[in-house]
Curated annotation (Swiss-Prot):
SUPFAM superfamilies: Class II aaRS ABD-related (SSF52954), Class II aaRS and biotin synthetases (SSF55681), ThrRS/AlaRS common domain (SSF55186). Disulfide bonds: none annotated. This is Threonine--tRNA ligase. The gene is thrS. Residues 221-523 are annotated as: Catalytic. It comes from Gloeobacter violaceus (strain ATCC 29082 / PCC 7421).
């Protein structure tokens, strides 16, 4: 399965160029109507942000005339502009720039578009001494008109669009956020620039709400909580983008894997295991080597004989391996569908600057499965996969705030393989299933994998951020490239259709999302440490251990805090570690065979003192409900 790591994560941004169907898409759903950050016209907000980036550059060149300008686009949640300046921007500089931007905005200056003859534009840029703009200009289509936008006595080479006047930009609805390094045109061999990031909104209230959510997002950052909860670490010696899972983190992974593995067995999946490397020929046959090579690690153990390229590569995907398992014997139509599943680790050669915590890594595990079905089985099996994914989301308390993105081919692009007919059949199958299931979906052209269209579930977390989670893909093309067959009822050899699916997607990224969604407060069934028993003094450690043994015998994850800390400190430590249930035991509890139950369930009072078996019944009830 082609699984794209980058998480669609935004506190506000809508999906661009959407085609909404069946009651709308996620950004127009009832759940979003009262979201202050979603009350803006996205096109208007884009113009405001783009124009604010121009105001930023105008202010910078007024305050620091030696600065050269490069590019300044609108981005999700704001804008940035890259500058070439001999000295670094300081926090004090940002305050001065922001003040100057407000002064400019309050002048209510028009932003006027002008078309300029090519030669005249070249002369202007040369006279200004703006080498970066000149380089951009020289790369423009010679037949296309060249335009600039003028604001007062300052102008920028730009195609737009922009607001008509700075009066449309509220002086208290934007803020400069930070300065970061950037290379000209993203090339490490080119000049290093300074990038100033900012955010802009229609109203001060929206800005305030955005900043509030960003502060909350910092508290929930999975990198911060991952360290505090002892789930994973990184090592410079191991390398960037390669997380190391600690015992608690590994246990969390195991819990998720076992949960899905057991459910898959109920639904007819068979577990397989495949190697981490393979001959490059495997990926040449699949097409990955030609369409995905830049994202793969380089060849290992290479040899060249008469110009032939040979060697091994670390796998970027699991599907070609599952195909080889299917192909190892001839199958009858009676055996189909065949559902092969694996928690397979794959490797992508991400650039170091693109790595980020668990959301963008170089080695990650995908809950990959590939179904080999007859054309007649495709619709039913696709719907069953969607049902499995929805079951997973419900079980993990992710709610119903999902929309479906139908990631289809851009027919004008050459990045895809396979025939038009194969693509049309696959896209039609996904569209029909989505309509039959009543999914709220939108079509995103150009988002398909290079060998097939897919349905991506888009999830909105507790902060209103959007993430891509589970994926289902229909594939007529790889069965053709690998010449897969089954024996039909009439004895003829026919091609199966493949369904690729991954409810979690990248397990690493999925865990990052869970950490941030729950702010580290995992549901009881999912928490690596479910219960911590706190003896009041050393005298009651033995009783605490006996309670732990009883819980462990019932396959609950329990620990005893046998430290010499006072009880208040033990309770605080348990709360900081976000252990769902704390059991306090002292003389009274030891004598009566009870425990004092403290719970972290929001809105639920502590259960008070209960007999051990009643406390166990309470825990088992919550575990059964996955709360």
């Amino acid at each position: 399965m082609t699984f794209r790591q980058p998480a669609r994560r935004t506190l506000s941004g809508r999906f661009g160029a959407l085609k909404c169907h069946n009651g709308g898409c996620s950004c127009d759903s009832k759940a979003m109507e009262n979201d202050i950050l979603r009350q803006s016209d996205p096109e208007k907000l884009h113009r405001i942000r783009h124009s604010t980036s121009h105001i930023l550059a105008m202010a910078v060149q007024k305050l620091f005339p030696e600065t050269k300008v490069t590019i300044g686009p609108a981005i999700e949640n704001g804008f940035y502009y890259d500058f070439d300046r001999p000295t670094p921007f300081t926090p004090e500089d940002l305050k001065k720039i922001e003040k100057e931007m407000r002064r400019i905005v309050q002048q209510k200056l028009p932003l006027v578009r002008e078309e300029v003859p090519r030669e005249a534009m070249r002369e202007r840029l040369e006279a200004l001494g703006e080498p970066y703009k000149l380089e951009l200009f020289e790369g423009f289509d010679h037949d296309a008109p060249v335009s600039l936008y003028r604001t007062g006595d300052w102008w920028d080479l730009c195609a737009g669009p922009h607001v008509e006047s700075t009066a449309e930009i509220h002086p208290n609805a934007f803020k400069l956020r930070s300065v970061a390094g950037a290379y000209w045109r993203g090339d490490e061999k080119r000049a290093q620039l300074q990038r100033i990031y900012g955010t802009a909104w229609e109203t001060p209230e929206q800005l305030e709400e955005f900043l509030r959510r960003e502060e909350e997002a910092k508290k929930r950052d999975h990198r911060k909580l991952g360290r505090e909860l002892g789930l994973f670490v990184f090592s410079d010696l191991v390398g960037p983008g390669l997380p190391l899972w600690t015992p608690k983190g590994a246990l969390l992974r195991y819990i998720l894997e076992e949960f899905l593995r057991k459910e898959q067995v109920k639904r007819g999946y068979q577990q397989v295991v495949t190697p981490h490397i393979a001959r490059v020929d495997l990926f040449k046959t699949s097409g990955h080597w030609f369409k995905y090579k830049d994202d793969m690690f380089p060849l290992m153990a290479t040899s060249e004989e008469e110009g032939a390229e040979e060697g091994f590569v670390m796998k970027p995907m699991n599907c070609p391996f599952h195909i080889q398992i299917y192909k190892s014997e001839l199958h009858s139509y009676r055996e189909l569908p065949i559902r092969l599943a694996e928690f397979g680790t794959v490797y992508r050669y991400e650039q170091s600057g693109e790595l980020g915590g668990l959301t963008r890594v170089r080695g990650f595990t995908v809950d990959d499965s590939h179904l080999f079905v007859t054309p007649e089985q495709l619709d039913d099996e696709f719907k069953k996969v969607v049902d499995l994914i929805q079951f997973v989301f419900r079980s993990l308390q992710l709610g119903d705030g999902f929309s479906a993105r139908l990631s289809f081919r851009d027919p004008t692009s050459d990045k895809y393989i396979g025939s038009d007919a194969a693509w049309e059949k696959a896209q039609a199958a996904i569209l029909k299933a989505s309509q039959d299931l009543g999914l709220k979906y939108f079509v995103a052209e150009g988002e398909a994998a290079f060998y097939g269209p897919k349905l991506d579930f888009i999830f909105r977390d507790a902060l209103g951020r959007e993430w891509q989670l589970g994926t289902v893909q229909v594939d007529y093309i790889l069965p053709e490239r690998f010449e897969l067959e089954y024996v039909a009822e009439d004895g003829s050899r026919r091609r199966p259709v493949m369904i690729h699916r991954a409810p979690f997607g990248s397990l690493e990224r999925f865990i990052a999302i869970l950490i941030e969604h729950f702010a580290g407060d995992f549901p009881l069934w999912l928490a690596p440490e479910q219960v911590r028993i706190l003896p009041v003094t050393d005298q009651f450690v033995g009783y605490a251990e006996s309670v732990k043994d009883r819980l462990v015998s019932l396959e609950m994850r329990a620990e005893v805090d046998a430290s010499s800390e006072r009880l208040g400190k033990k309770i605080r430590n348990g709360e900081t570690a976000k252990v769902p249930v704390l059991l306090v035991v002292g003389e009274s509890e030891a004598n009566s065979g009870t425990v004092a139950v403290r719970t972290r369930v929001e809105g639920e009072k502590d259960k008070g003192t209960l007999p051990v078996e009643e406390a166990i019944a309470y825990l088992q009830e919550r575990l059964a409900k996955r709360t």
